[in-house]
Each structure stands twice: as C-alpha cells, then as structure tokens.
Amino acid sequence: MGSRALPPGPVQTLIFLDLEATGLPFSQPKITELCLLAVHRYALEGLSAPQGPSPTAPVPPRVLDKLSLCVAPGKVCSPAASEITGLSTAVLAAHGRRAFDADLVNLIRTFLQRQPQPWCLVAHNGDRYDFPLLRAELALLGLASALDDAFCVDSIAALKALEPTGSSSEHGPRKSYSLGSVYTRLYGQAPPDSHTAEGDVLALLSVCQWRPRALLRWVDAHAKPFSTVKPMYVITTSTGTNPRPSAVTATVPLARASDTGPNLRGDRSPKPAPSPKMCPGAPPGEGLLAPLGLLAFLTLAVAMLYGLSLAMPGQ
C-alpha cells in the first residue's frame, strides 16, 4: 500500500475515534480511555443537512456499533488531564482497569473486522494527537502494523474544507476549530459530556452530520492509509527488547581490556616475550660479547702454536 494510496472504492464505514490520555504529546502520554463508533455510509447518505440559523443537533443513526473502554495507563496522569477528563491513575487502578495490551488490540481488530470495508478512522485533531498516540501504543507492543489496513482523516481538515467561503471574516477574530467551538457554532449549545471519549465521539458524529454527503465525498478523496502515520514517540529499552547493544555496553569492555590481564580478548596485540639470549634490563647487543671474546681467544692460541712450530724446525 503506497504512502498516498486512496481507498480502493468509496469508504463504507466511518469509525469515529476519540482517545483520552495522561497528558500532552511532549510528556509521552498513555491512553486512559478510548471510544470507537462505527457508522455505515448508508446511514449518512440519506440524511438531510440540519436547517435554520441554530438547528438542533441531529439524533445519531439508529444502526451503529460502539466500543468504549477505560485503560490503566501505567503512568501518572497530569493534574490538568485528570481535571479535564475526570480520570486518574489511582481511580483507574481502583476500578481494576487493565493496560493497553495485545488483548485490547485484538478486540479493536475484531470490532473493525465486523464492519464493511474500506474503513476510515475519523478523529478531531487526529493527525496531531489521536492517530500518532494510537500508533505509539501499538508500536510499544510490537504491533505497529495491526491497523495498517485502515484509512484515516482528520475532521478539522474536513470541516475547514467544507465551511462556506464567506463564513469567516478576514478582519474578525480567528475562528476556532476545537470540537466544542464547532459544535456550539453549528447547534447553538455546548456539546454534552465533553472530554469523555464517548461524549466527544458522539459530538463529532453530530458535527459530521451537518453536511453528511459533502463529508463523504471529501473523505473518499482525502483518506490516507493509517500505516503512513508516524508514532507520537518511540521508547527504547535495554531489558531484552532491543537486540542491539547500546554505545555504553559496546565501548566499556574494550576500554577495560587494555588495563587487565591477558585472559581478556580485547587486547589483540600482545607484547612478545623477552628473547632468552638477552639479559633482562641489558642494552641490546650486550649478549653477543661472550661468544665473540671466546672466538678471539681461540684464534690467538692457534696463531701462537703455529708460530712455535715454525721456530723448532728440527723436530
């Protein structure tokens, strides 16, 4: 599947997604709650856009599937996150919630496989938060490719594209595209149950029911493979999960090898043993004096004997 591949045909199921977590991206957050709400395109194609200056929020489709779970994050929630979501690590532990694990990934996979394909995940600010965070959680389990057959879109980009051209003032305040602001702008009231995963998913569905057929056309043209999303963060560990040694473990033994005995194999250039012909501590060449002196003495003795034999001819 290419990095710019579009779905093989019209998206059949929109999977509205929201995650609550322990904090912002810089803190390497962990998921505390997730909700997926699956709606078939048939449920949206037959809808008419809400009418009037402040229409009431539409009722969700009668036929939909929903998966909502709280998750033990394994780290402390930031005070701000706990205040917004109403969840804390202690509360989740007290309720016996389990971690984001392989069983949960299988549950998500099973939920998706019950829906007609192609699937498209839809999340508000998904490109910057929900999708990268979900990819990070999958990667930590070694299951980074578990959802690679899904597609995804960020509903903020969709709403900006679908908004009427003259709806924003060039000189007025910058229009907010937070989920609460968009919902209030469309329906004249704040969304119920904000900052719960299920409440935000239902609010997002209501927003997408504003111009449902135009939304479906935009999704078909702009959905991207979930496999192209980069994880929000990557955590490397040294306790059996990373087969490659770190720089520290690779260099420290080599540094110690030159300072220890010959049993270590780090020193590949052992010093040669002293020659048996050399006296330890003597200058080179001094060991040759003894044999040279003996040779000179024998030569002198032979010469003297030869001289004596010449001096005694009568014998």
From Swiss-Prot:
How the cofactor is bound: the record states: Binds 2 Mg(2+) per subunit. The second magnesium ion interacts with only one residue. Substitution with Mn(2+) results in partial activity.
Please give the chief subcellular localization of this protein: nucleus
Query: Which stretches are transmembrane?
Result: none
Q: Which catalysed reactions does the entry list for this protein? A: Exonucleolytic cleavage in the 3'- to 5'-direction to yield nucleoside 5'-phosphates
Active site location? H195 (proton donor/acceptor)
Give the enzyme's EC designation. 3.1.11.2
Membrane topology recorded in Swiss-Prot or TrEMBL: Peripheral membrane protein
Q: Which CDD domains match?
A: TREX1_2
**What ranges does the record give for the region Necessary for cytoplasmic retention, renumbered to this chain?**
282-315
Q: Could you say which cofactors this protein requires?
A: Mg(2+)
* Residues annotated as binding Mg(2+) 1: D18, E20, D200
Write down the superkingdom of origin.
Eukaryota
Ordered alphabetically, the record's keywords are: Cell cycle, Cytoplasm, Endoplasmic reticulum, Exonuclease, Hydrolase, Magnesium, Membrane, Metal-binding, Nuclease, Nucleus, Phosphoprotein, Ubl conjugation
Give an example GO biological process.
Answer: DNA catabolic process
Give the binding site residues for substrate.
E20, A21, Y129, D200
Under the GO molecular function aspect, what terms does this record hold? Answer: 3'-5' exonuclease activity; 3'-5'-DNA exonuclease activity; double-stranded DNA 3'-5' DNA exonuclease activity; metal ion binding; nucleic acid binding
The segments labelled Disordered in the record are 256-282
Question: Which EC class, in a word?
Answer: hydrolase
The record's GO CC annotations read:
cytoplasm; cytosol; endoplasmic reticulum membrane; nucleus
* Binding of Mg(2+) 2, residues: D18
Where Phosphoserine occurs, the residues are S78, S167
On modification after translation, the UniProt record reads: Ubiquitinated, but not targeted to proteasomal degradation. Ubiquitination may be important for interaction with UBQLN1.
What does the protein in this record do? Major cellular 3'-to-5' DNA exonuclease which digests single-stranded DNA (ssDNA) and double-stranded DNA (dsDNA) with mismatched 3' termini. Prevents cell-intrinsic initiation of autoimmunity. Acts by metabolizing DNA fragments from endogenous retroelements, including L1, LTR and SINE elements. Plays a key role in degradation of DNA fragments at cytosolic micronuclei arising from genome instability: its association with the endoplasmic reticulum membrane directs TREX1 to ruptured micronuclei, leading to micronuclear DNA degradation.
Q: How does it assemble?
A: Homodimer. Interacts (via proline-rich region) with TCERG1/CA150 (via the second WW domain). Component of the SET complex, composed of at least ANP32A, APEX1, HMGB2, NME1, SET and TREX1. Within this complex, directly interacts with SET; this interaction does not result in TREX1 inhibition. Also interacts with NME1, but only following translocation to the nucleus. Directly interacts with UBQLN1 (via ubiquitin-like domain); the interaction may control TREX1 subcellular location.
Q: State the name under which the record lists this protein.
A: Three-prime repair exonuclease 1
Q: Which gene encodes it?
A: TREX1
